[in-house]
Structure formats: structure tokens, C-alpha cells
Amino acid sequence: MKAKFYICNHCGNLVTTIHNAGVPLVCCGEKMKELVPNTVEASGEKHLPVAELSGSRLTVTVGAVEHTMADVHYIQWIFVETENGGQIRYLNPGQAPSTVFELGSEKPVAVYAYCNLHGLWMTKL
């Protein structure tokens, strides 16, 4: 199942689904908006995840030019989608915009990064 992410336009809640039953996701009394990766007008070189697979270890860095990690502008999380599911890592201001995923026998399909100002970014693998 392809990963999909949704946001509440009122409170900012972000969710993903484990099973999509086909009914709209609702928050604050309104339908949540699906986030479409790579559609915000911003620098791709600072937002697109860069992934390097070495054996079962996937290293992901956000941006060919490293993304800032300031209190007001940073990457909140990185998600790796695999053939059988996925893993997420949460980041904080001041940390490097990178993480390592141990995938075991899982095959990575795509990596996503979420910028608090410029939204969702994705690189297919």
C-alpha cells in the first residue's frame, strides 16, 4: 500500500493510514487534506530526501544542500516506505537533518521528509 499523509488545516494534526476504508478522514469537524509530495514552491535541493543503501542500512539526509534545522524552520520527520510497510524517525531543531533506518530484508520503495514550512517531499527509490 502506497503511503499517504493527511493534514488538518485548522490544528495542523498530521496522520497516515494503516488501512484505508475509503471514508474521509476528519479533524476539527472538517475533512483532512491529503498532502501531495513535491508540490510546494521551494528549493528541491534543500528538501528532497537523499538516500544511500548499504546492505540493510538506509541512510537518509534531507537535501543535496543540507536543510536548516532552526527552531522556526526544520525537518520534523523522515519516513521510509518499504514493500511491506514503513518506518518513521522524528527530528528536532538543532539535530542533523538525517537518520539511519535498519531495514533487515525489507526493500525500500520511497523516502519522505516533512518540512514544517514547506510541507511534504518524496524521493522514489
What are the functions of these language-model segments?
Residues 116-124:
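Short acidic/polar inter-strand loop motif in beta-rich domains
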Residues 107-117:
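Short, aromatic- and glycine-rich surface loops/edge beta-strands on solvent-exposed regions
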Residues 5, 24, 112:
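Residues immediately within or flanking Cys/His clusters that coordinate Zn2+
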Residues 97-101:
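Short strand-edge motifs at loop-to-beta-strand transitions and within beta-strands
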Residues 21-31:
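Cysteine-rich micro-motifs
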Residues 17-21, 35-38, 123-125:
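Short Cys/His-rich "knuckle" micro-motifs
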Residues 62-70:
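Short amphipathic, basic-aromatic surface patches that mediate peripheral association
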Residues 8-11, 27, 115:
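Short cysteine-rich clusters marking metal-coordination/redox-active sites
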